[in-house]
Every structure is written in structure tokens, then in C-alpha cells.
């Protein structure tokens, strides 16, 4: 799959701190600082040890530089057993909001002329996974933000509803990257793994 570094830079998912700063529209600097700090204090913290254990599961035995299709399948099966019933209502509600955001004449025209939205969207998400993986490797396995994003996108590729993918494909076709970033940020904010200690432990039983 061809790597497109420029696309990665445009559409990478911001960190929690960056998301708060991007969303703030206050003119008063002290108010901005207080509001952002308050939000950050209330954000859940991901368990990076869980993420690293998942990474070992989804990589080739003895070679953590390569993702394993078998390992990914094993992880996704575990995630479905442990998390899916808990997260499905949130995933469905989010997907419905995506449709509310995107339904317009331009989107309808795009859908009518596209024949393979699903596969194109999966390929685009696969590219992002590869780029986040590269970023994680470049950091010598220290960039936990990139690690979380690649794991979240692996989950999303299998468990987002089918009608999400035409929306994602549409977001990739627009010149404005903000809608694509909105989709990716919203999926990350579902906290699909690494935030619930009891459930996380079940992934490794």
C-alpha cells in the first residue's frame, strides 16, 4: 500500500491536549487556560500497559516491527467478546450523528457516482494504520499516542457500521480536512479500549 506522508500530516488524530485547544474559541486567555485545564483534568487516562500488551498480541512473534494478520484477528475476536455489546450503542449513535452531519446534495452526488466506497475507505484507514505504526516505531516504541490511534483504527475497521465507510470515503475526497479529522477524533473519543480496567483484563484471559 502506497504511503502518503502528506495525507497523514493533514488527517492525523490530535492528542487530547490538542483537541481541547482546537475546540476552544475564547478571546480571554485566562478563561481559555482555565477551561482547557478543567477539561483535561476530567479526561480519562488510557492504560498504556494495556496498549503495549495489545501491541504484542497484534505483532508477529519475535518481531514487533511487523503487524500480524493472525494476531489482529485474535485481538478483534477478543475485543468483540469483551467490549462489543458495551460499545455498540455508542458506535451506532455516533454513526447516526455522522450521517446527520454529512447529508447534503454534494454527499448524495458523491455516493451516486461511487461504486466501491467500502473498499476505498478501508484502504484509506489501512494507510493511516501503517503511518501511525511507522510513527510508533520511529519513536522506539515510546509514542503511546500513535499506538492508541493505530489500535483504535484497527478496531474501527472491523466494527464501525458498513454505512460509515461511504461517509469516511467522502471525507477523504474533500479539500477541507476538518471533516475527516472530526470523524477520526470522534471515534477515538469512544474510548474503545484501555480505559476500563476490568474489561481490559478480560482481553488477555
Curated annotation (Swiss-Prot):
This is Uncharacterized protein C03B1.9. The lineage of its organism: Eukaryota, Metazoa, Ecdysozoa, Nematoda, Chromadorea.
Amino acid at each position: 500500500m502506497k504511503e502518503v506522508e502528506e495525507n497523514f500530516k493533514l488527517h492525523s488524530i490530535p492528542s487530547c491536549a490538542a483537541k481541547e485547544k482546537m475546540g476552544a474559541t475564547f478571546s480571554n486567555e485566562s478563561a481559555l487556560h482555565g477551561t482547557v485545564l478543567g477539561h483535561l483534568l476530567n479526561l480519562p487516562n488510557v492504560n498504556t500497559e494495556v496498549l503495549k500488551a495489545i501491541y504484542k498480541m497484534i505483532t508477529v512473534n519475535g518481531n514487533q516491527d511487523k503487524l500480524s494478520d493472525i494476531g489482529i484477528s485474535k485481538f478483534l475476536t477478543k475485543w468483540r467478546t469483551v467490549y462489543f455489546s458495551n460499545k455498540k450503542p455508542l458506535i451506532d449513535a455516533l454513526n447516526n450523528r455522522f450521517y446527520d452531519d454529512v447529508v447534503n446534495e454534494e454527499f448524495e452526488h458523491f455516493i451516486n457516482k461511487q461504486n466501491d466506497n467500502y473498499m476505498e475507505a478501508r484502504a484509506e484507514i489501512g494507510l493511516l494504520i501503517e503511518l501511525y505504526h511507522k510513527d510508533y516505531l520511529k519513536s522506539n516504541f515510546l509514542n503511546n499516542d500513535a499506538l492508541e490511534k493505530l489500535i483504535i483504527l484497527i478496531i474501527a475497521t472491523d466494527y464501525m457500521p458498513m454505512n460509515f465507510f461511504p461517509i469516511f470515503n467522502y471525507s477523504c475526497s474533500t479539500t477541507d480536512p476538518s471533516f475527516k479529522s472530526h470523524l477520526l477524533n470522534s471515534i477515538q473519543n469512544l474510548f474503545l479500549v484501555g480505559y476500563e480496567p476490568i474489561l481490559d483484563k478480560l482481553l488477555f484471559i
